[in-house]
Amino acid sequence: MSSKDNTCPPPGPGHINGFHVPHYAFFFPHMLGGMSXTGGLPGVQHQPPLSGYSTPSPATIETQSTSSEEIVPSPPTPPPLPRIYKPCFVCQDKSSGYHYGVSACEGCKGFFRRSIQKNMVYTCHRDKNCIINKVTRNRCQYCRLQKCFEVGMSKESVRNDRNKKKKESPKPEAIESYILSPETQDLIEKVQKAHQETFPALCQLGKYTTSFSSEQRVSLDIDLWDKFSELSTKCIIKTVEFAKQLPGFTTLTIADQITLLKSACLDILILRICTRYTPDQDTMTFSDGLTLNRTQMHNAGFGPLTDLVFAFANQPVPLEMDDAETGLLSAICLICGDRQDLEQPDKVDKLQEPLLEALKIYVRTRRPQKPHMFPKMLMKITDLRTVSAKGAERVITLKMEIPGAMPLIQEMLENSEGLDTLGGGASSDAPVTPVAPGSCSPSLSPSSTHSSPSTHSP
């Protein structure tokens, strides 16, 4: 039998792969490209046979007639007109759209979202009626948040937005793996080292007590006040040294370094002294070993702030924190883009992000059975700010009650010039004495060298 006998006859002109053309030609026009000219539809010009199927270009429209085929280009689609929004209702900057119920810029949208999600508590240092515009919006967070509420921004919109995102992108219920990357491990070690070098642990101290004002509360014991003033001054110096060792801190502008140090000084002082709390004795120990009970802390100058500080110290979270966690939480308190008057808040936020991630992974690795410990630690920042706001009020009261020169802690909280010598100055191991309002404190310069290891903070 010849090879011709083994070859199947080609399908008829009215068939394509076994299907009758009239039934499918209009549903599968691309199949027509493989047909011969004699088997096509009448009046329609066809392309030569191609290997496989050919698809008409989407850029053309085929207009069929009984005599010819015309190729007409598609008219171009005009681009949509850009939407124009009213200026930001909060600061009058250029709006990026409607956010949380009102026309707002990206800056005010992000500020409002962070404030609500983190339950931030702000304080106005003026009359609670600051002008908020594009230029002044970062100067007073309290008034900026109030302006957000006044123009109609909604808390519920922030919460609903978070819930909506959770529903739209559900995460698998598989257990997350918290493995420290080399970069995160290195960051934790650097922060822990910075903390330990500037704040010795309670077990390293030789504790001693004093009989001054140990039994009865008085308005102020001058001897204890003098001692506390000396120790708080050393604490501030050590806080500056701690900040200088944090990765990226010295890359910020000098003005932002000053702002962050002044804003977080009292937060860190309170957090640190609370980690030296001994619950069974109800005492706190300073870095030179001085141990004071609740009554003595009151008489040393804490006054009505005393019970707030002891209540914070007696919570489970501060009692369970180790050096790495205390250091990371202190760094997060310090490097915070929500502080007022920052020149580069976005850069500060970017420096804070790896610290937050490091704390989260470290806490969950250390306590796999307590998944809520990390958010509880972050909530302590809000508590700290509440206590430190009361502390700032107490400092102002003490300034009026005690005549003469101010200790450094009062200068930092009261006088905007207290840290303005950051660009240069003496070494921080130089003797520090109380300074008068309006003078500078070269010992606090983050650009200066480290102080000697023998000087400890409270």
UniProtKB/Swiss-Prot annotation:
User: Taking the first listed entry, what is the main subcellular location of this protein, grouped into a coarse class?
Assistant: nucleus
Superkingdom, natural source: Eukaryota
Look up the coiled coil feature and give its residue ranges.
none
Q: Which SUPFAM superfamilies does the UniProt entry name for this protein? A: Glucocorticoid receptor-like (DNA-binding domain), Nuclear receptor ligand-binding domain
What GO molecular-function term can you cite, just one?
Answer: nuclear receptor activity
Q: Which Pfam families match?
A: Hormone_recep, zf-C4
Q: Which residues form the NR LBD domain?
A: 183-417
Q: Does the keyword Zinc-finger apply?
A: yes
Free-text comment about domains: Composed of three domains: a modulating N-terminal domain, a DNA-binding domain and a C-terminal ligand-binding domain.
Q: To which protein family does this belong?
A: Belongs to the nuclear hormone receptor family. NR1 subfamily.
Quaternary context: Heterodimer; with an rxr molecule. Binds DNA preferentially as a rar/rxr heterodimer.
The molecule here is called Retinoic acid receptor alpha
Q: Which organism is it from?
A: Xenopus laevis (African clawed frog)
> What gene name does this entry carry?
rara
